[in-house]
């Protein structure tokens, strides 16, 4: 290089190397302007459409084949029904996808690969073809059409309503369901018409859990019963031993099949689901037993529960088996009883003994009639409570109702009174037994005065109720209390029936009979007095001697007549009096017709003086008797009218019912303060302050009257 060269010369480049193309000022200026922004934004700005097209041409990604066959029940959805997915992220709606924008006619593909998927999800945990949403006929209900989700066996799976979906199965989806795919946090809400939504539950989630738990218990119970039957059969076979050919030709009894199908059990439950207690009562009446529930309590306060149990006498293949149904309820005692009856009906229906066929019932009725309605195991000699007779009556009634000739008993007033007396005697007997049990308990708890102080204290605690009765005494007391309660209820029922069946009594009829009898006796007494006076008057003329009545003083004669009347009243009955009156009348007439007998002159004079007096007295008696009869008839008529008026007044009182509503309206409408109150003057002060219209004189008078009081 020479010094004369004034400028620096750049070295020459090989011909194969080309100089870089000059960049446009816009491209050079862009990084300087957006240096503060994110790097991705800068890269997106730098890359042009030509560069992206060049990349796509260089990188060729071929979509894999979708291995999915459309089922035969698939169909196209109705265009009028719009279904879509709402995509939520962190509780916010970020996007939505309409299912009508699908590539296929009947299904939607959900996945991560763009060319072959309808709904594109970019999370790395989502498979290329993740799942299929297929539209078609509803396979479960066969009543409509809808969408079904089909998991394609993805690596991280899918969840519907927070439950993992099984692979390669069609699951019916409803409007309102939510979906999650892979490990993505985005939630897809399925939106559509209300007709496709799931029906609401008829119970709460807690009740659903209880139902599920109950079904599990029933399944365990059925399994345990089946296992017990198998064990019993094995035990019987082991105990049989060698038959020696004695049972040759005998037909084996068919085994009782235990029904375990849930759908069949639901159909059969319709018989006793509405009223299980009534269905169970029919079973016990048919078997001839009493339905006795046993109750017990558990816990206290908010943990208090009622436990109800009942023992079921079940005969399976000729073998008596005892099952116990129980139920625990925290609501009430009645609910526990109903639930226990429902469980008992289910157990009996499982072994097909709750409802027997008509042929078996007819054979059972004939067998009972042949055995005089007694069971084969009944022993009257050992029965001391009369329970066997009651069971026999129940069996007899049930058998007669089954044969068609139902026995109807009509109770009368006398039969009801007889039954009432018997129930009262039963109440007294039950109370007597209870008193004897209580007295025996008290006697066993008596405290000895001697001994240790600690022993006395413990006995005192036992006496006060610390220990209580033993189990046997409690059972006896409970049994007699139940009998007492049943007898008491029966007595109350019979008392009501006796009041209803009591013959009607006509008011005034008894009074009329008593008054008529009293009037008859009074009339006969008066006639007796008349007869006695006649005899007294006739006594002097019977003998030839002088008259003793004339010699007696005037003061003695009335007393003697009264004494004679009293003696005659005591000695003579009404029938005898009537006969004597008739005889006296006949004898007087006969005496008048007889010829006269010669008598002394003094006697004739006395008789001649007394005869007009006797004739006048007889006419007076007849008039008085007729007057008495008229008075009696008038009194009877007045009494009948009075009784008729009283009956009419009572009928009016019954018909005219005073309505309290009218009285309240009348009281409310009245302007008086305290109207309608009996002691109004004592409870209410009716004084009112003076009005402006009153004169000054009245106001001054009132001020002077109440000065110093107010």
Curated annotation (Swiss-Prot):
Stretch list, region Disordered: 1-40, 230-250, 535-560, 591-619, 671-710
Which regions are flagged for Polar residues bias? 538-560
**Where is the sequence biased in composition, kind Low complexity?**
15-25
Q: What Pfam families has UniProt attached to this entry?
A: dsrm (PF00035), FHA (PF00498)
The source's superkingdom equals Eukaryota
**One annotated GO molecular function:** mRNA binding
InterPro entries given in the database record? Cell_Proc_Reg/RNA_Proc, dsRBD_dom, FHA_dom, SMAD_FHA_dom_sf
PROSITE patterns hit by this protein: DS_RBD, FHA_DOMAIN
By what name is this protein known?
Uncharacterized protein ZK632.2
Give the originating organism. Answer: Caenorhabditis elegans
Coiled-coil ranges per UniProt: 206-240, 409-440, 471-502, 613-661
FHA domain segment(s): 108-165
Q: Taxonomic lineage of this organism?
A: Eukaryota, Metazoa, Ecdysozoa, Nematoda, Chromadorea
Q: Does the keyword Lipid biosynthesis apply?
A: no
């Amino acid at each position: 290089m020479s010094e004369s060269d004034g400028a620096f010369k750049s070295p020459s480049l090989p011909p194969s190397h080309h100089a870089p193309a000059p960049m446009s000022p816009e491209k050079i200026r862009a990084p300087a302007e957006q240096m503060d922004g994110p790097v991705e934004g800068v890269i997106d700005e730098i890359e042009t459409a030509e560069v992206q097209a060049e990349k796509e041409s260089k990188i060729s990604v071929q979509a894999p084949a979708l291995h999915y066959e459309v089922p035969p029940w698939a169909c196209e959805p109705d265009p009028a029904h719009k279904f879509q997915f709402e995509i939520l992220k962190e509780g916010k709606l970020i996007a939505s996808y309409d299912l009508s924008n699908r590539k296929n006619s009947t299904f939607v593909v959900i996945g991560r690969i763009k060319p072959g998927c309808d709904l594109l999800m970019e999370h790395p945990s989502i498979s290329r073809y993740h799942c299929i949403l297929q539209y078609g006929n509803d396979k479960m209900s066969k009543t409509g059409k809808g969408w079904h989700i089909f998991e394609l066996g993805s690596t991280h799976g899918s969840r519907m309503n927070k439950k993992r979906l099984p692979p390669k199965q069609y699951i019916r989806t409803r409007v309102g369901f939510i979906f999650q795919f892979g490990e993505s946090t985005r939630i897809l809400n399925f939106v559509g018409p209300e007709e496709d939504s799931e029906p609401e539950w008829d119970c709460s989630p807690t009740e659903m859990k209880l139902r599920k738990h109950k079904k599990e218990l029933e399944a365990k119970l059925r399994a345990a019963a089946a296992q017990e039957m198998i064990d019993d059969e094995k035990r019987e076979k082991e105990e049989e031993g060698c038959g020696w050919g004695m049972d040759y030709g005998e037909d084996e009894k068919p085994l009782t099949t235990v029904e375990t199908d849930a759908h069949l059990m639901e159909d059969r439950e319709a018989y006793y689901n509405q009223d299980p207690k009534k269905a169970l009562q029919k079973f016990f009446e048919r078997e001839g037993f009493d339905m006795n529930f046993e109750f017990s309590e558990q816990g206290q306060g908010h943990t208090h529960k009622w436990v109800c149990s009942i023992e079921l006498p079940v005969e399976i293949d000729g073998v008596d088996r005892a099952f116990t149904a129980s139920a625990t309820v925290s609501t009430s005692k009645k609910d526990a009883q109903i639930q226990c009856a429902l469980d008992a009906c289910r157990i009996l229906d499982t072994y097909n003994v709750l409802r027997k066929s008509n042929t078996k019932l007819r054979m059972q009725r004939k067998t009972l009639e042949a055995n005089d309605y007694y069971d084969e195991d009944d022993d009257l000699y050992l029965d001391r409570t009369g329970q066997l007779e009651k069971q026999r009556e129940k069996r007899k009634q049930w058998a007669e109702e089954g044969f068609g000739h139902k026995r109807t008993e009509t109770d009368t007033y006398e039969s009801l009174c007889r039954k009432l007396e018997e129930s009262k005697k039963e109440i007294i007997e039950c109370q007597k037994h209870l008193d004897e049990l209580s007295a025996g308990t008290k006697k066993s708890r008596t405290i000895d005065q001697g001994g240790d102080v600690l022993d006395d204290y413990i006995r005192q605690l036992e006496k006060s109720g610390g220990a209580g009765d033993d189990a046997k005494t409690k059972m006896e007391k409970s049994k007699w209390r139940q009998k007492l309660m049943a007898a008491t209820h029966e007595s109350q029922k019979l008392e009501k029936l006796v009041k209803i069946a009591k013959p009607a009594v006509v008011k005034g009829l008894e009074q009329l009979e008593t008054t008529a009898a009293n009037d008859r006796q009074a009339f006969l007494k008066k006639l007796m007095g008349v007869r006695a006076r006649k005899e007294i008057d006739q006594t002097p003329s019977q003998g030839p001697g002088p008259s003793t009545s004339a010699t007696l003083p005037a003061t003695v004669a009335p007393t003697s007549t009264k004494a004679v009347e009293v003696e005659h009243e005591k000695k003579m009955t009404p029938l005898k009096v009537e006969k004597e009156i008739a005889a006296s009348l006949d004898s007087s007439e006969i005496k008048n017709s007889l010829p006269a007998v010669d008598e002394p002159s003094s006697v004739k004079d006395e008789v001649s003086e007394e005869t007009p007096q006797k004739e006048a007295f007889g006419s007076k008696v007849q008039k008085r008797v007729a007057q008495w009869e008229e008075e009696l008839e008038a009194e009877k008529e007045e009494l009948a009218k009075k009784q008729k008026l009283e009956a009419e007044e009572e009928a009016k009182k019954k018909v005219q019912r005073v309505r309290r509503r009218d009285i309240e309206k009348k009281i409310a409408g009245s302007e008086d303060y305290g109207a309608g109150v009996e002691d109004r003057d004592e409870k209410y002060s009716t004084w009112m302050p003076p009005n402006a219209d009153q004169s000054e004189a009245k106001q001054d008078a009132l001020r002077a009257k109440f000065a110093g009081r107010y």
